[in-house]
């Protein structure tokens, strides 16, 4: 948990230093949720898949909750910090880089922020920490994913 606490503190203090258009290529691949290392509510299973090419991020999230319900979220958007439509009607997402190993995602529906994620690569790019916030900026959860 020390790593999660240190990363959370760092993410909240680091200024935006990297260009918004420079993707974090080390995020490419599949990531599995480690629920035991995560904080706050989380599904029993969650997989993130990133396919990043210059200027574009393809993202797929699949999950299973405690009741067996399945979740799916996916997009293919330019990595430029601007709002782009997702596959959910009325929803947009934007992705921008905050630092060498940190990106910031804003999800909106009908022009209102619904959630944000700060994603940080740690442990030699083998661990991805995702900090989820609601539309008002309150931290909902900190999820730890391991590279597959």
Regions found by a protein language model. Give the residues of each.
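Bacterial N-terminal signal peptides
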Residues: 7-16
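Positively charged n-region of N-terminal signal peptides that target proteins for export
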Residues: 1-5
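Hydrophobic small-molecule pocket/channel-lining residues, especially in calycin-type beta-barrels
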Residues: 22-148
């Amino acid at each position: 948990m020390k790593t999660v606490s240190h990363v959370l503190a760092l993410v909240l203090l680091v200024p935006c230093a990297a260009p918004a258009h420079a993707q974090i290529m080390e995020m490419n691949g599949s990531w599995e949720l480690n629920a035991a290392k995560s904080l706050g509510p989380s599904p029993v299973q969650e997989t993130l898949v990133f396919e990043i090419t210059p200027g574009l991020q393809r993202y797929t999230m699949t999950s299973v909750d405690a009741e067996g319900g399945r979740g799916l979220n996916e997009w293919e958007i330019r990595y430029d910090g601007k709002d782009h439509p997702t596959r959910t009607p009325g929803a947009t997402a934007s992705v921008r880089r905050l630092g060498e190993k940190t990106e910031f995602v804003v999800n909106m529906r009908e022009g209102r922020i619904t959630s944000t994620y700060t994603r940080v690569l740690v442990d030699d790019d083998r661990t991805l920490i995702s900090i989820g916030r609601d539309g008002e900026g309150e931290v909902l959860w900190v999820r730890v994913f391991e590279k597959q």
